[in-house]
């Protein structure tokens, strides 16, 4: 009888923890993805040290003295193939 009570209490505890857990904390959460986009630079915007990082892991190209850095398109995008 004592074992059944312990199992019941454990089950109720796990159910309560499951209900109280954050509903969608996955890295693909749309709110997190949208927040990341707000913190990144689009194509041909400034990027690099002191600026935002490039969206969609685009390359951040700088001139020879490492200033005037901008986000560039992927090579495949230049030919119209997408990412």
Swiss-Prot record:
Name the Pfam families for this protein: Toxin_9
Q: Where is the signal peptide?
A: 1-21
Q: Name the UniProt key words of this record, in alphabetical order.
A: Calcium channel impairing toxin, Disulfide bond, Ion channel impairing toxin, Knottin, Neurotoxin, Secreted, Signal, Toxin, Voltage-gated calcium channel impairing toxin
Q: Which SUPFAM superfamilies match?
A: omega toxin-like
Q: Which Cys residues form disulphide pairs?
A: 40-55, 47-60, 54-71, 62-69
GO annotations of cellular component type: extracellular region
GO MF annotations in UniProt: calcium channel regulator activity; ion channel inhibitor activity; toxin activity
Tissue spec. comment:
Expressed by the venom gland.
Tell me which Gene3D superfamilies the record gives.
Answer: 4.10.40.10
Q: What is known of its domains?
A: The presence of a 'disulfide through disulfide knot' structurally defines this protein as a knottin.
Question: What is this protein's function per UniProt?
Answer: Antagonist of L-type calcium channels (Cav1/CACNA1). In GH3 neuroendocrinal cell line, it reversibly inhibits the A-type potassium current but does not block other potassium currents or calcium channels. Shows an important acetylcholine-mediated antiarrhythmogenic effect in isolated hearts. In vivo, causes paralysis in the posterior limbs and gradual decreases in movement and aggression during 24 hours at dose levels of 5 ug per mouse.
Q: Which family does it belong to?
A: Belongs to the neurotoxin 02 (plectoxin) family.
User: What is the protein's name according to its record?
Assistant: Kappa-ctenitoxin-Pn1a
Q: What is the organism of origin for this protein?
A: Phoneutria nigriventer (Brazilian armed spider)
């Amino acid at each position: 009888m004592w074992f059944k009570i312990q199992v019941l209490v454990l089950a109720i505890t796990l159910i309560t923890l499951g209900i109280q857990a954050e509903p969608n904390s996955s890295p693909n959460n749309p709110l997190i993805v949208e927040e990341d986009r707000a913190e990144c630079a689009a194509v041909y915007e400034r990027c690099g040290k002191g600026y935002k990082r490039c969206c969609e892991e685009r390359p951040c190209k700088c001139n020879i003295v490492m200033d005037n850095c901008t986000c560039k398109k992927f090579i495949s995008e230049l030919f119209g193939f997408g990412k």
